Amino acid sequence: MLRLLALFLHCLPLVSGDYDICKSWVTTDEGPTWEFYACQPKVMRLKDYVKVKVEPSGITCGDPPERFCSHENPYLCSNECDASNPDLAHPPRLMFDREDEGLATYWQSVTWSRYPSPLEANITLSWNKSVELTDDVVVTFEYGRPTVMVLEKSLDNGRTWQPYQFYAEDCMEAFGMSARRARDMSPSSAHRVLCTEEYSRWAGSKKEKHVRFEVRDRFAIFAGPDLRNMDNLYTRMESAKGLKEFFTFTDLRMRLLRPALGGTYVQRENLYKYFYAISNIEVIGRCKCNLHANLCTVREGSLQCECEHNTTGPDCGRCKKNFRTRAWRAGSYLPLPHGSPNACAAAGSAFGSQTKPPTMAPLGDSSFWPQVSSSAEAVAISVAVPSQAKDSTLFELKPRSPQVIPIEEFQDCECYGHSNRCSYIDFLNVVTCVSCKHNTRGQHCQHCRLGYYRNGSAELDDENVCIECNCNQIGSVHDRCNETGFCECREGAVGPKCDDCLPTHYWRQGCYPNVCDDDQLLCQNGGTCQQNQRCACPPGYTGIRCEQPRCDLADDAGPDCDRAPGIVPRPDTLLGCLLLLGLAARLAC
């Protein structure tokens, strides 16, 4: 009976598929043991576990009460938003509630009554944990979709942000980018950030409501239109750099930059029809457990993986104590169909089960100790001792080669899972980690390498404890940043990565002072400022800001040039000539 049960458990992963089994009990020549497989949690509606934040304060309508109109009938403004009345209030929670059939509930912003000041809103969705997208993100807007919007993501619980996708009715005008569609991207560019015009152009507030972040279109590049070739998708997830991470985040943020305009320009006489209204946000995905768990549950108010393979942490991102014989690694989808678990292991165990530790070899037996394989590594772990001068009366140091020893043999060696080897330098009485990984450095791999900074939301033994600074090469002084991830910017550059400019500067392969603007550096004599870089002067004027009349051209002289038919010299020119003639006459005498 036990043999039949073991056979059933062994065959179960073969028929279940989709990486949903983490381990099975098998019988081997050495006896029964666990066999591990790469595994992942089931797909779920992530919006059921999200925390939402709407900024700035006061952007939600109803305090004070406010009336608003629709684009279809802008002069019938009988609708009202009142936060004190439950029937008329539109709080943020209505973006995630379950709606009765035929009755839409929605969050709504204030109207654009303060035009021309921008009407902008940030909607941040936080899970306090890494999650992975498996389907499109779909945002449903009532009363029209925004004409300009940015979707951003964070990998560190909202400390830093990066663009995910740009949306605009004119991508070139709004962001200086050409419009593209996800379905038209190549396999090598499937994880690139793009700007789309598909979801921003006016088509009626009731006809087109949805704005999408297209995950399925990107998957289809590898798995086919019907997503039937998932084996190819899983293979590319492992082989294509950055593809798997592209669908991973801890937070999403929608930056609503300009509301629906009804297909026209802003009409100042009726600003009560311009606002944002969102009735639903659908996010389909799963907990990111690094292929070390098939369950994800809510604990202490947050999603957490139920880790297998002797791993631990919210994302199964580190090895359990006493299972750190080798450095932690994420599981892999390859080889198909069950992948590689890359389980953490105790000393002497192939799969991570606790076994009897190996017998210690005598210190003189060099075959027990792993050998340093490269000269570069040897330099990194040894200390050179200078030769003693003949007339020295101090003391003599007898250099000895440092011993590189497996980590489990050192009680004082803690590398936080970033190395599995230590070196003991006896004449310094120092135990230090060797070959720190995951962009760490230091005696215990406790510091980040230059060009990286500490991830405050990760434990010290997390693989993602160090985040790359990613400083803009042109806008920053160097590639290093401070402990919060902010880079040191050159003059005129701003932003965490120095990839933006002060309002007094413009970007052109670096930040340069504005030549003109619409505030203080005005173009004169009817000139127009073009992208803060130059003034386009009308006929008859020249200069940096069109301040100089062009008196040198008879057919193109400005009104400040005194001229008549035949180009009569100006009075001040005649006076100068007379003075010169008088001076010449005196000298001749």
From Swiss-Prot:
Signal peptide region: 1-17
Domain of life: Eukaryota
Tissue specificity annotation: Expression is restricted primarily to neurons of the CNS, particularly in the cerebral cortex, habenular nucleus and superior colliculus. Low levels in lung, kidney, heart and spleen.
UniProt cross-references to Gene3D superfamilies, sorted A to Z: Galactose-binding domain-like, Laminin
GO biological process: axonogenesis; modulation of chemical synaptic transmission; postsynaptic specialization assembly; regulation of neuron migration; regulation of neuron projection arborization; regulation of neuron projection development; regulation of presynapse assembly; synaptic membrane adhesion
Pro-sequence residue ranges: 567-589
Membrane topology listed for this record: Lipid-anchor; GPI-anchor
Keyword Lipoprotein: yes
Stated role: Involved in controlling patterning and neuronal circuit formation at the laminar, cellular, subcellular and synaptic levels. Promotes neurite outgrowth of both axons and dendrites.
Domain remarks: The laminin N-terminal domain mediates 1:1 binding to NGL ligand with sub-micromolar affinity. Three NGL-binding loops mediate discrimination for LRRC4/NGL2 among other NGLs by binding specifically to its LRR repeats. This specificity drives the sorting of a mixed population of molecules into discrete cell surface subdomains.
Protein name, UniProt field: Netrin-G2
Taxonomic placement: Eukaryota, Metazoa, Chordata, Craniata, Vertebrata
